[in-house]
């Protein structure tokens, strides 16, 4: 019973780890599509801290960083992501690198094709030694991204990794392998307000179709608000939840954001607790921003 429970929990935690990244896509599109790398053309570094049960010691917590930029006159984008996801005594880590090649399109639009490779390091229970050992699991992803001043869209498979078995041949981890399609458009409302409605459709084999309906608003290129309704999120738990966030451009180079999720889709036991919500903060540094990016 203990062995089965441990194996199940470690498998759940790795899938949970990926869901943490997926949920950040409105603030960090690189988390679901490697073709986004370098789309801003200037370097940027983002740090995220995600925590559940703020008043509880040893509560689930995730730290992640994301960085990307462009080289070769903007034709090649490079990206990097890393995270550490801890829940009680269990912790998983991951690091992923992305590269994208950008094609010039009519009307100053860009079309990018991107690839991602990396590794997840997860705790696996070894029945032959009755001990927990860390296993490295390859992570692969691909994507296509189109961007213009009036429209953006992308399709991606952010996780094409395989599966892991223990010494007895039992599966202890299988990648969920979601396929994602995203589209949206910035709409100017007056001289100082921009609305950005968008949609994300995700599909995982043998699961219902996931649909996110999103709306962001920026005012004077200084303050932003966002709301997202997510149905059948692409994580361990198929759940519907709301995500709300606020962003503030402290300086030309520094942006701060706060995100609130009404549910914790990445936690296998989230529905058993009274406090189901989770909080996240982001700090972004863009030292040489060429223009304001939403």
Q: Model-derived features: where do they sit?
A:
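Outer-membrane beta-barrel translocator/channel fold
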Residues: 18-31, 35, 50-59, 79-153, ...
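Conserved catalytic core of Hanks-type protein kinase domains
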Residues: 37, 70, 218, 249
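N-terminal glycine-rich anion-binding loops that anchor highly charged ligand groups
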Residues: 35-44
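Detector for outer-membrane/organellar transmembrane beta-barrel domains
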Residues: 141-230
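Bacterial Sec-dependent N-terminal signal peptides
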Residues: 1-19, 187, 215, 277, ...
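Short polar/acidic secondary-structure junctions
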Residues: 39, 72, 104, 188, ...
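Glycine- and aromatic-enriched membrane insertion/assembly motifs of diderm outer-membrane
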Residues: 56-78, 157
């Amino acid at each position: 019973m203990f062995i089965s429970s441990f194996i199940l929990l470690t498998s759940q935690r790795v899938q949970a780890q990926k869901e943490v990244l997926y949920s950040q896509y409105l603030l960090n599109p690189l988390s679901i599509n490697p073709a986004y790398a370098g789309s801003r053309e200037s370097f940027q570094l983002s740090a995220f801290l995600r925590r559940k049960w703020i008043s509880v010691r040893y509560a689930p917590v995730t730290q992640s960083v994301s960085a990307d930029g462009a080289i070769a006159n903007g034709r090649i984008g490079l990206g990097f992501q890393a995270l550490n996801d801890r829940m009680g005594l269990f912790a998983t880590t991951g690091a992923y690198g992305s590269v994208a090649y950008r094609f010039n399109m009519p009307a100053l639009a860009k079309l990018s094709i991107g690839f991602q490779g990396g590794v997840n390091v997860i705790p696996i229970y070894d029945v032959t030694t009755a001990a927990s050992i860390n296993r490295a699991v390859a992570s692969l992803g691909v994507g296509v991204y189109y961007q213009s001043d009036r429209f953006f869209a992308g399709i991606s498979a952010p996780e094409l990794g395989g599966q892991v078995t223990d010494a007895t041949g039992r599966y202890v981890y299988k990648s969920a392998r979601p396929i994602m399609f995203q589209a949206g458009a910035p709409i100017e409302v007056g001289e100082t307000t921009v609305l950005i409605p968008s949609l994300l459709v995700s599909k995982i084999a043998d699961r219902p179709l996931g649909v996110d309906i999103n709306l962001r608003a920026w005012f004077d290129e200084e303050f932003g608000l966002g709301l997202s309704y997510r149905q059948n999120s692409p994580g361990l738990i198929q759940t519907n939840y709301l995500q709300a966030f606020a962003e503030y451009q402290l300086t030309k180079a520094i942006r701060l954001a706060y995100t609130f999720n009404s549910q914790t889709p990445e936690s296998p036991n989230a529905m058993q607790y009274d406090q189901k919500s989770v909080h996240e903060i982001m700090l972004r540094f863009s030292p040489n921003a060429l223009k304001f990016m939403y």
